[in-house]
Amino acid sequence: MAVHHSTRPFTPGTAPLVSFAEEVFGYLPRADQRRWAHAYLEGLLSTPGKKTVRRLAAAVSASPTASQSLHQFVNASPWDWGPALRSLAHWTLRRTVPRAWTIGTVVMPKRGESSVGVHRRFDPASGRTVNCQVGVGIFLSTETEPVPLGWRILLPSRWTDDDTLRERARIPESSVGDRPASAQVLDLVHTIHSRTTATPLPVVADMTSCTETGSLLRGLHRTGCDFVVAVPASLAVLPGGRTRGEAQDTPVPVRRLVYQGDGFGEVPALLGAPGPVPGGQPRRLLNTLVRLPERPGARPGTDTTPPVLRAFARRVPGRQADEPVWITNLTRHSAEELIALTGHHARTAGALRVLEDDFGLRDFEGRSFPGWHHHMTLVSAAFAYSRLADATAARTDRPLAVVRSA
């Protein structure tokens, strides 16, 4: 069972929170909506333990109708969460040194089948098949801590093909159709780019459990994004950077090329790379150039020339099978730079645990699609405030210490 604890001293009704709530949610057209947005934030920041609507309401109001009003605001009130996330992104960028966009996934166990997006799936973290919702978030990874700035909920075909379920959960037409995890990540990246004008940042993601990783890499390449993505060990790739011939046109698992390739080279002495090394043995980085095969079903010659990418993995004696394989288009970066970027994923996983334990990320009690997004937006705002309220606002266009590959 998770241990809930307060992450930051908080005094209810403080002027900084009032100002923050007005900056992020001031666009809401009605005064009562703005008031309940502030109340929800205050409740998330001050309520220990599980963040049910009833407990949040009790923390901020003595009114017997507060719980009903707060529930109405989150689950039934038809407000657009997009402007709040746009304002939150601008507020966050002014107070941080951005390093990367990272992708985090959260599995939210649920009872029953009525909550939007609920389905059964295997959860690698628990090793069990669970009844759950699955959320995918995009985080701004900074010099201090990642901050969530956008969310998508995975909707299996049961939820998108059934008109009755869609109407009951208020799922918009724009979210209907084949929307696997890779498409949701691409949509998050596109949306965050449309909301900010910050210096372009690399996208860092662990997609080792995703069956459409190739589609994600192609999509990121098409949009001009730099990326560092952990991929399934079985992902089929072609050797890159060598004269193409019959042998080089046969796709092979990426792990085989990285770990068993002949003469692809190693980069020694990765100072500061995350994770212990058994017996003080040296870390080394195995790496090789690869290309993605043409898309399945694509007519010959219709795909653009596949880019040359770098696949790499740490070689750590004694735990080789546990090391993920990463693919990046930052082919000119040093081993130290690449390892530093992969470290942002671990930090995002840590931020997700804090969001779950201390900010009620998994405590949404409603059933609708808008309600889920309202809750996730408010949780994101509360988390950002708890981490950055004391930071000094500065310019948003700081240069990133990453040189784009040619």
What are the residue ranges of the model-derived segments?
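Gly/serine-rich nucleotide phosphate-binding loop at the start of the catalytic core
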Residues: 2-71
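Electropositive, glycine- and tryptophan-enriched low-complexity nucleic-acid-binding patches
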Residues: 126-197, 322-323
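Active-site-proximal, Lys/Arg-enriched surface segment
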Residues: 78-157
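An anionic, glycine-rich sequence signature occurring as long contiguous blocks
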Residues: 146-147, 159, 228-232, 237-344
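A short, flexible helix-boundary coil/loop motif
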Residues: 1-19, 25-33, 155, 244-298, ...
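Short, conserved catalytic/metal-binding motifs centered on acidic residues
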Residues: 56, 99-109, 138, 201-210, ...
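Domain-level cores of phosphate- or acyl-group-handling catalytic modules
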Residues: 169-241
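Short amphipathic alpha-helical "interface-anchor" segments enriched in bulky aromatics
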Residues: 107, 257, 332-366
